[in-house]
């Protein structure tokens, strides 16, 4: 969450409390360690059938909620059990009862933590959306063309948005207070039962937040939401190696998605969470001597929730993506990193990003953003398109002495398909662009060395997302590449990208119908002229202008499809094809050699307005553009078919 206009301190004051502080107090607890202690007590006693059933039910509740621990636990279970066993003497039947009580505490805490984290994630999404809308509204306030009535409407909208932020925060605060109160009540009841069973609870000290007093051994405080990547990085580098490993083990979900943490560390954390999501189902299948498919087919029978199954399926898709990209070259496997991972994001479609090569050490980094129909759930990370792999291999061949890392970024909620009504509006692009900007800007903070070059590439609806990340999200990169772009929304020209010397490159096949949608921008503006609120919220139909037009200020490279005869929707998916004109150009750009496009004959003329020829005395025939018409004439139409081939492969290094 990167807020520009909402002040968190002021928001907390207006809402009457700090929901983030409550969530952090709950996460100070360590439910997995309590569960391990419970299992040790359970195993040490002479278990009755009743105790076994109670323990298994508590264990099921814990496993269904807990997803924050990995690896060995620092608590000395055997020593604690031996201490209590010695105190109880022959009353060993009490040991499994203590195990049940402890397991219930672990389950209650894990459930409270999970509910609190989900509510905070919802709040942050709401605040980010409101902040983005405020940014657009405040920018419009400076427009001298606004009529008095429109300005009044705008002021009312800003006031409404500010109140929405307060109301959303107050609502989250109330829910989190209720979650914490419910856990505290259960904790006190369980502690009373433990004392009745003969256990003083000494092994719980520091593990059962929020009731335990703060001690030096309490978990290290992780930077709160909204903390910038530079501050996070300073915090991370101030920790010892042991402290970092402890955080990765105890709070992998937070560390794995925290911009400012080095890529290798966040990858370790994300892989730990992914592995747990896989093993939650696999271990149950093993325990019941059945198949994973049987467990997936009837999860309730085995004590699993629908959320557990969603986590498993998206973890499986992500693991396939890691394996697929790592096996790129069997003789020389590529190092891969799980840059981001949240299997429950976007209503279960999932969020993940895989890096081929380490962006922290590579001289060049390319981030590719897919378009409509792409998701973790749908298999984009490992399907046959191989967008990231093809770009990685060609950029490496173009300049092997200066490695290029490629991040396949499935970090936003893309429209489901071409029948999804959201595809016609920029709302998802604006929300996704804000998340993309945060991730990309964090790369500059963790990079080692000097001279980093970052290129962000978007395809289809993903190119609209990239444009909004620059224009609205303040994304910092050297170059932008827009492929088959249906419109650039809030980026009205190349200047809106603020590239500081870089370029906006455009690949638009003359036969790709999606890349022509931006030519309808004038019509969209006319239709939406009275819908100010819809424009601000990204709900108005229309995705913006065509960046391949001659007035945009972009650099267009050749991206034609061999043997294509006229407008063809399939040509929209050809850009990353190995040997294509587009991939050849992208490899040059991503490896820092965009200036070679001209000498390689890969530049294309921009689209332009239709014109009429007029004979002017002394000048002869002159073509004049027809005012008010879109840039709908494509010079690439006139290319001889034989000049369009798919043999543009870097067989040997060109740049050393």
UniProtKB/Swiss-Prot annotation:
Composition-biased stretches (Basic and acidic residues): 645-656
Residue segments, region Disordered: 623-656
Pfam hit, one: Hydro_N_hd
Lineage top rank: taxon: Bacteria
Protein name per the record: Uncharacterized protein MT2140
Native source species: Mycobacterium tuberculosis (strain CDC 1551 / Oshkosh)
Organism ancestry: Bacteria, Bacillati, Actinomycetota, Actinomycetes, Mycobacteriales
